[in-house]
Amino acid sequence: MNIKIAALTLAIASGISAQWAIAADMPASPAPTIPVKQYVTQVNADNSVTFRYFAPGAKNVSVVVGVPVPDNIHPMTKDEAGVWSWRTPILKGNLYEYFFNVDGVRSIDTGTAMTNPQRQVNSSMILVPGSYLDTRSVAHGDLIAITYHSNALQSERQMYVWTPPGYTGMGEPLPVLYFYHGFGDTGRSAIDQGRIPQIMDNLLAEGKIKPMLVVIPDTETDAKGIIPEDFVPQERRKVFYPLNAKAADRELMNDIIPLISKRFNVRKDADGRALAGLSQGGYQALVSGMNHLESFGWLATFSGVTTTTVPDEGVAARLNDPAAINQQLRNFTVVVGDKDVVTGKDIAGLKTELEQKKINFDYQEYPGLNHEMDVWRPAYAAFVQKLFK
């Protein structure tokens, strides 16, 4: 007999409630006399953050805030109620990503609703107010989730479209930015972690950007034989990235751009179309942007994988025609954190090649930063302020 069924039967026979018998096999819970605020993470009045984690049986708990490097690991202390905590110094306004290390096991914060919506969710987020990432009292655009059939991939797909406040589809056609997220992320990552809607709302309210649409496809195609989780990390550059980039490129040109052009009142000229992405999405932007140079007037890669480590014949051929690139692109932006250990060599190689071939580009290096959102959010905000002007 199943052990749980046997225990339940015994409990009922003994006059013990079935509810108690099931609960006895559940993890510990905070005492009902403790207010919830005493065992969940919170932003304090002075913009410090108190991280909390309820784990009365744990021996060691720490919180890792930001990129998982030694300086960002903070030991926590346990109180009599079994709540581990650590309070930060006063923080600047920003969105902070974090996770807990509980006796060697990585854990999200179960006391908050804000997790990073990756393909495998393994970190949480907390917003400290006081930056352009806030949801301010300004006119807000709309965020539309579109489910569609991709003929290129022969599957049902989803993408997100941000439209500016008051957009009705009437009047002059608007330009479009197509933005690709990074490896392991989803379209929601660009929205929730990247804060694209808030950035666009706030910059538009300040008159710093032109009205435009932002289209956020899923960088991962999940096509047959191109499932990210099927590849060990050592095979990503050699096998996965090239295969996925070609599939995503077909989807962009054959499905996504035609669908957006049909469903929304948007410009169809190259100067009215921008393409950008971060990390793996930066590689996607480079591949599609260079292979279809005539279709885009603006291009950006933020800490992107490049052909320095992942060759692409189309990109290589286009980079050998500097005059065509300089004539076609109104702006080509390349961004990286100077401590980037993931794609730093990629960007360095691309930068050298662009300089040697005298290809025009804007270059921004963020000091002291790694492969992280503290590079990509400011880079995104800076790039959209250049567009369509």
Curated annotation (Swiss-Prot):
The record's InterPro entries line, in alphabetical order, gives: AB_hydrolase_fold, Esterase-like, Glyco_hydro_13_N, Ig-like_fold, Ig_E-set, Mycobacterial_A85_antigen
A molecular function (GO) term: hydrolase activity, hydrolyzing O-glycosyl compounds
A single GO BP term for this record reads:
carbohydrate metabolic process
Alphabetized Gene3D superfamilies for the sequence: alpha/beta hydrolase, Immunoglobulins
Entry-linked SUPFAM superfamilies: alpha/beta-Hydrolases, E set domains
- State the superkingdom: Bacteria
Q: Name one Pfam family in it.
A: Esterase
Q: What is this protein called?
A: Uncharacterized protein YieL
**Taxon lineage:** Bacteria, Pseudomonadati, Pseudomonadota, Gammaproteobacteria, Enterobacterales
**GN (gene name):** yieL
